[in-house]
Amino acid sequence: MATTTDLEKLRVLLPHWIEHNAEHAAGFQEWAEKARAVGQEEVAEEIALAAKELGWANEALSAALKKLEQAA
């Protein structure tokens, strides 16, 4: 069972993870464009997919944060 301290940590960690993932996703998009520019379309597609998946992860983390805030 989560302790109050664990819940407090989650309130700090979730926004941090969301921001961190967004920064990585932006970097992935930048590198996908660079890969595309040098003719590496398949590589670019995989990197872009990773960026998109981080976006999905952030949606889940944001939903978790919202539920945590509603429970408070």
Regions found by a protein language model. Name each.
Residues 2-29:
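N-terminal acidic leader/helix
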Residues 4-7, 62-72:
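Short, charged, intrinsically disordered terminal tails
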Residues 7-10, 14, 40-43, 47-50, ...:
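Amphipathic alpha-helical coiled-coil segments and their boundaries
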Residues 17, 21-25, 47, 51-61:
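Alpha-helical transition-metal enzyme core signature, strongest for iron centers
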Residues 22-46:
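Short E/K-rich amphipathic alpha-helical oligomerization segments
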